[in-house]
Amino acid sequence: MPNIVLFSGSSHQDLSQRVADRLGLELGKVVTKKFSNQETSVEIGESVRGEDVYIIQSGCGEINDNLMELLIMINACKIASSSRVTAVIPCFPYARQDKKDKSRAPISAKLVANMLSVAGADHIITMDLHASQIQGFFDIPVDNLYAEPAVLQWIRENIAEWKNCIIVSPDAGGAKRVTSIADRLNVEFALIHKERKKANEVDRMVLVGDVKDRVAILVDDMADTCGTICHAADKLLSAGATKVYAILTHGIFSGPAISRINNAAFEAVVVTNTIPQEDKMKHCTKIQVIDISMILAEAIRRTHNGESVSYLFSHVPL
């Protein structure tokens, strides 16, 4: 493709390479390093004048360092006269801080949106935003892609009894997500209502729906410490589910997450590769990965060629 340059930040180079391979491109030359005082240094190693630039950087790992690196890369390309800079952020950082849920709380997702715009981003491509209203925090175009088509494909190909499954949301907020998947599979859905006492602590869970003698598939956009989904798995099995799977777009898996998954009764915990999972998979055989590089690659190709991206909301590109 002419007039396109693809750069990778240091957060998820494996995903960036997969996207580049699918597009038939070489990743652009960029050197990122830290000065002795821990400031981030970025050197763009090739001309981007008049080019359509895409920078792939996920909000994972050392999140603050990676966000700063992305902002500097965007700005470096912008002031080097690139025609357009698109930030491809598979897992959007600070997405859970999207509203004032208590007094004096910051809306950090809005701050990140402002920072990206000020740095010089012209367009954002992301996946399964924790809250879809984050798109409205930007004054530039945002394409929020969905992992749902890839999730549906995985369910049909890997769960033999999928026609006898029930899609379960671990909280009321994910009801829209699970009803969409349940409708596409033509199966029923259930949800678990949880009463939280404080962050990362779940108090009481109430199951709404009948899971007896069915394969329960928990679906959520992200899992961090995995307390919620592991409690939910126990709840579903005690309510008569034959097997429990969990399918998540963003597998953050921090703190006690891996030991909780190992001790829980999941058949599999399936995540996409918006966040690197290689190290986690070494310590947990239940984790399986859906590759979404083809969705990102096709979104980049369509954006570059001025084509519609909405086809990707319901189809997995070949």
Curated annotation (Swiss-Prot):
Signal peptide: none annotated. GO terms for molecular function: ATP binding; identical protein binding; kinase activity; magnesium ion binding; protein homodimerization activity; ribose phosphate diphosphokinase activity. Mg(2+) binds at D128, H130, D139, D143. ATP binds at R96, Q97, D98, K99, K100, D101, H130. GO terms for cellular component: cytoplasm; cytosol. Residues 212-227 are annotated as: Binding of phosphoribosylpyrophosphate. It catalyses: D-ribose 5-phosphate + ATP = 5-phospho-alpha-D-ribose 1-diphosphate + AMP + H(+). Pathway: Metabolic intermediate biosynthesis; 5-phospho-alpha-D-ribose 1-diphosphate biosynthesis; 5-phospho-alpha-D-ribose 1-diphosphate from D-ribose 5-phosphate (route I): step 1/1. SUPFAM superfamilies: PRTase-like. Its cofactor is Mg(2+). Keywords: ATP-binding, Kinase, Magnesium, Metal-binding, Nucleotide biosynthesis, Nucleotide-binding, Transferase. InterPro entries: PRib_PP_synth_CS, Pribosyltran_N, PRibTrfase_dom, PRTase-like, Rib-P_diPkinase, Rib-P_diPkinase_bac. Activated by magnesium and inorganic phosphate. Competitively or non-competitively inhibited by ADP, 2,3-bisphosphoglyceride or GDP. Pfam families: Pribosyl_synth, Pribosyltran_N. Its EC number is 2.7.6.1. GO terms for biological process: 5-phosphoribose 1-diphosphate biosynthetic process; nucleobase-containing compound metabolic process; pentose-phosphate shunt; purine nucleotide biosynthetic process; ribonucleoside monophosphate biosynthetic process. SMART domains: Pribosyltran_N (SM01400). Catalyzes the synthesis of phosphoribosylpyrophosphate (PRPP) that is essential for nucleotide synthesis. Homodimer. The active form is probably a hexamer composed of 3 homodimers. Belongs to the ribose-phosphate pyrophosphokinase family. This is Ribose-phosphate pyrophosphokinase 2. It comes from Homo sapiens (Human). The gene is PRPS2.
